[in-house]
Amino acid sequence: MDELPKTLDGSYERILREIDEEKRPYTYRLFQCLVISTRPLCVKELSELSAILPDAGSTLGFENGWRPENPEEFILSACSPLVTVVKDVRNNDANDGSEEKDNDYNDDDDDNAGDNINDDEDRVVQFSHFSVREYLTSDRIANTAHVSHFHILPKPAHALLARACLGVLLQLDYGLDDAKIRLLPLARYAAEHWVDYARFEDVSSDIQDMMDCLFDSNKPHLAAWLWLCDVENSRSRYQRTPSPTRPDAVPLYYAALCGFRDLSERLLRARPQDVNAWGGYYYTPLLAALHKEHPNIALLLLERGADVESRGRQLQTALYVASSCGYTEVVTLLIDRGANPNAQCDDEDVDVVKWTPLFVALQKGRLEIARILLRHGANVNYQDNFGRGPLHIASHHPSDDLALLLLDHSVDSNASDYWGRTALHEASSKGQIAVVTLFLERGAKVDARSKLGSTPLDEAKRYGHSEVVKLLLDHGADADAQMNDYRTAS
């Protein structure tokens, strides 16, 4: 009897060496998919991925006789005992095992075919142990004779999945419906995740032809992809919706949204007029690129004539979004192109209206952005819909850098909001000792009263900031001052 391996690596090496040679290409592709997949793969999805030819070029190629009668048995025969098949617990989360899950599938109901979740879709494949993944991607297997061909490198694996997903999407057309989707088990997965794989390192350059085909406005694939997947909010449309009938999607908008710079540049060369075209949830390609944190594409669009004053949702300008994200180069270019640093915007993230780029830069702690905005005329004493000025916002940060910047630009340190609260009230209530110290040194009124009669000392005591209490008292705060309800700070 052969001696058993003494280490996990030895065990894995032995298992890999015993895999039938004819199955090794399938096994390797299965391992690649499992290593880099952005979510658990169900049995049928992984079975189909394993059969995709890795060198099929710009089309989707499959091995002859590629679809096995029993996908789970096929996967386990190729990979066991390194992988296992388990119930997909994600399917139990929505309703805690309620009847809705049980009623999703009915073999006899063709009308519900698109909503079915069969056994293969309810079971996912995973490595038997986390160390299997670690071994397959390690230098140890790469340097081990006889099994080094199982070593998985990130870029080829991402390229394989990107090509596979795009190949599936390029089979979609305007007549898409749930019945057709059911015939393509990879369709939903491909729609949701191909961008993740294509964006990895330089993978997109290897699949340029396929991407160009998907984003060709004269072909049906882009509209079909957008019907299948809510790209902007990253939620698959499992609910049935009407099939698309109009190829009205703006390719440049979605290229910018997804972060594909080279593709965006090619689309701009083909249709420069689309640079300001309305595209979807974020309105323009420029705003989509900024919201999705692709500053390199924003710079490209600005160089090609993007409108710097276009507004998106909540009337937000590109300068507002770029200031929020901290994109110094984009902010500078926007201002150089004439963007208004005092344009008023709404922001549901902080439940306000009439904020300017300076406000959001301060709220996010973007010191350099704030400097640029102030240098180009941002109003340091502007008030939002609650009467708060920039200094109120800066006072919430532990560091005094932002507040000092505003004070050096002649901000009114005693300006009050609609409740009569000054920036010193705010800093005291938050316990920001450095900011309170700065305000007192710069002449802030230590006993300023709000409309309720509250002083900074009241705020510090209410929230238990003893250091701030002592500091305020040392600067002459009146401990016996009465609020409007006749309470005192003591």
Residue ranges and their predicted role:
Residues 1-278, 282-297, 303-304:
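Leucine/isoleucine-rich amphipathic helices and adjacent mixed helix/strand linkers
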Residues 244-252, 277-285, 311-317, 344-357, ...:
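Ankyrin-repeat boundary/"N-cap" motif
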Residues 262-263, 296-297, 329-330, 368-369, ...:
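Conserved ankyrin/ankyrin-like repeat signature
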Residues 274-275, 308, 341, 380, ...:
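Ankyrin-repeat inter-repeat connecting loop/turn
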